[in-house]
Amino acid sequence: MSLPNCPKCQSEYVYEDGILLVCPECAYEWNPAEVEKEEGLVVIDANGKQLADGDTVTLIKDLKVKGAPKDLKQGTRVKNIRLVEGDHNIDCKIDGFGAMKLKSEFVKKL
């Protein structure tokens, strides 16, 4: 049976210790069954609700946009969002502005 590389440092020198797998290089221990169960990206809006791809959200405050002649106003509706990794974790298109990246802390789910 071949063992997976360490999820922390990608070392190939992993060994079994009971039900856990152990990496001797970084001393990381993990249960391979739990790694498979982990969920992907979790994004929370300003009210604490979990967002998903395709949701519709509204802005909770005015946002200044660099290089744009006007701001995004509070209450602007954003349809069909896509969640991505990073500090600006919402990728979307806004009518009148085009493609934008937003932070989830400035939106609420409808």
UniProtKB/Swiss-Prot annotation:
Cysteine pairs bridged by disulfides in the record: none
Any one Pfam family match given in the protein's UniProt record, by short name: Zn_Ribbon_YjdM
Matches recorded under InterPro entries: YjdM, YjdM_C, YjdM_N
Family: Belongs to the YjdM family.
UniProt xrefs under PANTHER family: PROTEIN YJDM, PROTEIN YJDM-RELATED
Stated name of the protein: Protein YjdM
Annotated source species: Streptococcus mutans serotype c (strain ATCC 700610 / UA159)
